[in-house]
């Protein structure tokens, strides 16, 4: 059912993207399906960049630490429940209820954006899984020396969104919700050069992610970029 709902949405959008309006319905269907089937289904996860430390001759005394992205990946059970609850509540409150793509969310965002088209108040429909996929795409682009902002802007096109949806569905067929949440909490930007909740918790409060309280978790969830 999840894949069927997605296919209907993807087929409609793909037809808009790849087929001129003057061709027949059969040609639209064939071109859309071919284009959709050619989209990738897998995306690499890590290893993520981590800080590099220079030590003194004794091998233990730290002299300096260098990083473009301050990151310290941890397991899900090393992150406080408050933090897990906060990020799900802010980013995707129905994360554990819907599939990789939320048809309800897409419909809600579509209607909202039509109603508020003149005000500029746009609403997104990406699930937490889709956001994780998007972060992985950006991380891979940066590792290739590409610009993160340019990649993010490119990910907002219809074609990029369909690709994101397909990757998200494939991911949920191979990973549990908890595994996806763990990955997301280790890659998401939480202000400045801090990526992932462990690095952010250490940077802002000098504590581990497992010790984050309700207020701290809510603040970090509000910093998600």
Q: Where do the protein language model's features map onto the residues?
A:
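Peptidoglycan glycan-strand catalytic modules in the bacterial/periplasmic cell-wall system
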Residues: 48-225
